[in-house]
Amino acid sequence: SLPKAINALDVNGWEDAALGILTTDTRPKGASVQFQHLGRSISLSGIAKGSGMIRPNMATMLAFVASDVKCTPTLAQDLLNQAVNQSFNRITVDGDMSTNDSCMLIATGASDLCLDEDTDLVALFSHALTELMQELAHAIVRDGEGATKFISIEVLGGASSEECLQVAYAIAHSPLIKTAMFASDPNWGRILAAVGYAGVPNLDVNSLTIHIGDCLLVEHGGCAQSYSEAAGQEIMNKDEINIRVDLKRGDTKETVWTTDLSYDYVKINADYRS
């Protein structure tokens, strides 16, 4: 297979490569971004694979990103780590993982622009790399096994990044919440329960608020007085749902992206044989 792959190398072979790494994915995932610096155009392109077993630490996910800049391995690794932590390490489909994952950043050096010699270029490149990887990460979630909804979970007002992520992942990994999302059920009790058992020390559930979209769902430890089932249902019927939890105990915020849990998820994984 390797000689055949080598002979098939082509500068326009991104889609073939993206197709070649799929497993339970239903479609290839690729993205490109460009930005300008000193009158020059810098390009980044990437492909990714993943549909289930995505978190933690990327699990069965694969991602390959290339850019035409020059860069030392040390700086490239630092930039990659930063971008991964705000993209691929902020998504989850089922909370499951495996021993197989890779994410690579390749600096081809086709351009004479060198990241190590220009701090302004480093900042621009870091932003573009994170943007590209978030686009690929979101594509993985949208193609999650059996997924029918793309769910953003934003936790703000935290005392630390760690506790914001604790709450976000407690919500994202709850089978009861994920099945409620599949049913378009604005079940505030399940969300509040997950926030409560996330393990945040000295959390005051009477102070926090929970929104779905722009609709206030929870305040004062229970269902908000202003909440109406019709408003909640209208939001839940959408394909994209935003859950926002304000812990009201600090200035930190984090966002995690996930899916609902459908009948098809069970079918895909019951039928799959490796």
Model region roles, listed by residue range:
Residues S1-S274:
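A structural signal for small-residue-enriched, beta-sheet-centric alpha/beta enzyme cores
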